[in-house]
């Protein structure tokens, strides 16, 4: 089949998204609804599922009104990893739509969607090292080709995005707090508080952030009355520490693989300080750094539709449609 046109559905966590993407990289329709879980101080799975049930039909209806779905090649949906209830909603609605249109439906690995999102806007070649950093995942992957990935390392506890949100909660900010931490860090002194950069003296590409979380709790409770200056300095110190960990593990990954290209993917990859730190690392090591802009960093359906197009073109369509909350490479 040529000139693929795919409708993608993304419901792995707390974003409800639908997109229609062409093989040429044109995003014909794209809508993302971000749920409000602030009163829970984190993603509440049951609420997420109910919101997907309510919102997804509305977005699909708008997609139908905006585009002739008879022209679609197929439907694609995230099958994992993610929250099981949220995944079930997306998979069942994608299957129902595909049945009504008499179109095939394909499952997509959410992490592969993040990894390939950059190729929707920039035709970079394989192989490359991909650092996926989001609220639920932190991994280093040797990407050798479509469907050919090797996990080099991952977090042993908290994901980077999760750590940002937990710090925000400790400081009294609403969930999600990653952007608040980033904004405050701009005004802070990154050298005021020394935080443990766990595992940077160990070989391999695994991360650990639990020690940083414990250290942050001690710092915050030791301050008699925390000021805005204290908060800014804590955020800046934390951000500098996690960026240092990323650089260290990325350097080890590049040495293992020997690739000259790096891809930064996932929502935390939109953090300006982290991007600038990794850009400096890449420049100093004669490497090229690539990342998608804007909403393509976050959970979105355009990356799911694009991953399906890439897999169709490569002849890799074997992924099961069963929701797989712990799906890995």
Swiss-Prot record:
EC numbers: 2.3.1.234
Cofactor: Fe(2+)
Chain sites annotated for binding substrate: 132-136, 165, 178, 271
Primary subcellular site in the record, as a coarse category: cytoplasm
Record's keyword terms, sorted: Acyltransferase, Cytoplasm, Iron, Metal-binding, Transferase, tRNA processing
Location(s) in or outside the cell: Cytoplasm
InterPro entries associated with the record: ATPase_NBD, Gcp-like_dom, KAE1/TsaD, Peptidase_M22_CS, TsaD
Database matches in CDD domains: ASKHA_NBD_TsaD_bac
Regions crossing the membrane: none
A single GO molecular function term of this UniProt record: N(6)-L-threonylcarbamoyladenine synthase activity
Keyword tRNA processing: yes
Domain of life: Bacteria
Family annotation (Pfam families): TsaD (PF00814)
Cofactor binding annotation: Binds 1 Fe(2+) ion per subunit.
Gene3D superfamilies given in the database record: 3.30.420.40
Catalytic activities: L-threonylcarbamoyladenylate + adenosine(37) in tRNA = N(6)-L-threonylcarbamoyladenosine(37) in tRNA + AMP + H(+)
Gene Ontology BP annotations: tRNA threonylcarbamoyladenosine modification
Residue positions binding Fe cation: 110, 114, 299
Family (UniProt): Belongs to the KAE1 / TsaD family.
NCBIfam families: gcp_kae1, T6A_TsaD_YgjD
Cited HAMAP family: TsaD (MF_01445)
Function as written in the Swiss-Prot or TrEMBL entry: Required for the formation of a threonylcarbamoyl group on adenosine at position 37 (t(6)A37) in tRNAs that read codons beginning with adenine. Is involved in the transfer of the threonylcarbamoyl moiety of threonylcarbamoyl-AMP (TC-AMP) to the N6 group of A37, together with TsaE and TsaB. TsaD likely plays a direct catalytic role in this reaction.
Protein name in the entry: tRNA N6-adenosine threonylcarbamoyltransferase
Organism: Neorickettsia sennetsu (strain ATCC VR-367 / Miyayama)
């Amino acid at each position: 089949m040529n000139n693929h046109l795919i409708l993608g559905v993304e419901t792995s966590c707390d974003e409800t998204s639908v997109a229609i993407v062409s093989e040429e990289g044109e995003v014909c329709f794209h809508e993302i609804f971000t749920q409000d879980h602030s009163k829970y101080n984190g993603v509440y799975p049951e609420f997420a599922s109910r919101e997907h049930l309510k919102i997804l039909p509305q977005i699909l209806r708008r997609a139908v009104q905006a585009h002739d779905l008879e022209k679609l090649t197929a439907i694609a949906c995230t099958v994992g990893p993610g929250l099981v209830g949220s995944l079930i909603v997306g998979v069942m609605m994608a299957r129902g739509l595909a049945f009504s249109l008499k179109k095939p439906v394909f499952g997509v690995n959410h992490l592969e969607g993040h990894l390939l999102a950059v190729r929707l806007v920039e035709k970079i070649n394989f192989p490359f090292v991909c650092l996926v950093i989001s609220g639920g995942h932190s991994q280093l992957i040797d990407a050798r080709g479509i469907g050919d990935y090797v996990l080099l390392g991952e977090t042993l506890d908290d994901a980077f995005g999760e750590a940002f949100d937990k710090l925000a909660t400790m400081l009294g900010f609403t969930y999600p707090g990653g952007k608040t931490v980033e904004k405050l860090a701009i005004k802070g002194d990154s050298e005021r508080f020394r935080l443990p950069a766990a595992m940077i003296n160990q070989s391999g590409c695994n991360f650990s952030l639990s020690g940083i979380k414990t250290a942050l709790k001690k710092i915050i409770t030791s301050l008699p009355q925390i000021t805005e200056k204290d908060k800014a300095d804590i955020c800046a110190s934390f951000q500098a520490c996690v960026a240092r960990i990323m650089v260290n593990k990325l350097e080890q990954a590049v040495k293992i693989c020997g690739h000259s290209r790096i891809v930064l993917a996932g929502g935390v990859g939109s953090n300006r300080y982290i991007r600038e730190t990794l850009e400096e690392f890449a420049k100093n090591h004669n490497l090229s750094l690539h990342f998608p802009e804007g909403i393509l960093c976050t959970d979105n359906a355009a990356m799911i539709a694009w991953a399906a197009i890439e897999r169709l073109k490569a002849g890799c369509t074997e992924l099961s449609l069963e929701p797989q909350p712990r799906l890995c490479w």
